[in-house]
């Protein structure tokens, strides 16, 4: 089925409808699972030496010093244009503004007289950021991860990326307060952050995207007691666009293609009650595709994508909620009117002038988002991911006395005698004092 094929949703059977919203299967092959397991073992047992060996083997780079020096970081910044530095600073300002606003107010209440309950927030002490290498350095992800880590107050923020690390990544890391940067990539970087090595510190939580090996490494270390927590499950990137007859076909096409160029496994879906708009978008996609440097990649992604015609916008919303896209773009006449009905999406973009690119780079929202249907239970990355909540309770004598019989009754019903005794002993002590 080509992307030019218009699909009438209401002519499809329930089975066909489910198939249309089924994502391409992703699972680590047995060979990837075994390879990653071996890498984790080797890094845990051999440390820096094996990290250098893996750099030579996988990155074709001989690394002597794993830690990037301040002089190297300064030199990287000097090679960048002022225009790019100013753009990064503008993006960081917006990211700071949005994420600072996410600070939770403290909770301090009396649930009943003499029973005080609080909720306080503390930063995750140490975090590791992983940034992939490749021909297109993802320095924007540095901004998205390091900025909330700094706002949260994480004491240690370190970054790993495959050597040679792009100047843009080094500068972005320094700009956002990353304390240490290491020339380590792939699953071995995740292992180093999870277990520590002579050079790379062990961290409490690991953030960042990567290939199948990195994703599998994050999964494995997150399930080990000696490992580290991770940000969220990963999957291929995706966008769903809801458009009506008031949408601009060229704008819709550009948003679909900006997602499709991410990779051949990206998924793109258009939902519209207007078949004419669907046809015009398909034509615009073909026109714009011819001009893209990554046209081959985008074309592969489009082969698994969908143009779906519905009966109305309400049905578009229902289908979108069922799919739960990573990115949801609503290009309709009154886009904001639909927001309250949206229940599952990573990030929502409203109207003609809110392209996905804005959120990817500089509007202020975070571009690290749940994908592959995880929007049903997971949230977009935010300040809370770099923090943890802790509760505090304090009972006065009077508060304890008033609550004691309730606790004793509940503990006895669960046959937890020691729990009941912890209350009864105190009740008796109060009686003796009286």
Swiss-Prot record:
It catalyses: L-histidinol + 2 NAD(+) + H2O = L-histidine + 2 NADH + 3 H(+). NAD(+) binds at residues 130, 188, 211. The active site is at residues 326-327. It comes from the Bacteria. Its EC number is 1.1.1.23. Keywords: Amino-acid biosynthesis, Histidine biosynthesis, Metal-binding, NAD, Oxidoreductase, Zinc. Disulfide bonds: none annotated. Binds 1 zinc ion per subunit. GO terms for cellular component: cytosol. Pathway: Amino-acid biosynthesis; L-histidine biosynthesis; L-histidine from 5-phospho-alpha-D-ribose 1-diphosphate: step 9/9. InterPro entries: Ald_DH/histidinol_DH, Histidinol_DH_CS, Histidinol_DH_monofunct, Hstdl_DH. Substrate binds at residues 237, 259, 262, 327, 360, 414, 419. Its cofactor is Zn(2+). One of its GO terms (molecular function) is zinc ion binding. Zn(2+) binds at residues 259, 262, 360, 419. GO terms for biological process: L-histidine biosynthetic process. Homodimer. Catalyzes the sequential NAD-dependent oxidations of L-histidinol to L-histidinaldehyde and then to L-histidine. Belongs to the histidinol dehydrogenase family. This is Histidinol dehydrogenase. It comes from Salmonella paratyphi A (strain ATCC 9150 / SARB42). The lineage of its organism: Bacteria, Pseudomonadati, Pseudomonadota, Gammaproteobacteria, Enterobacterales. The gene is hisD.
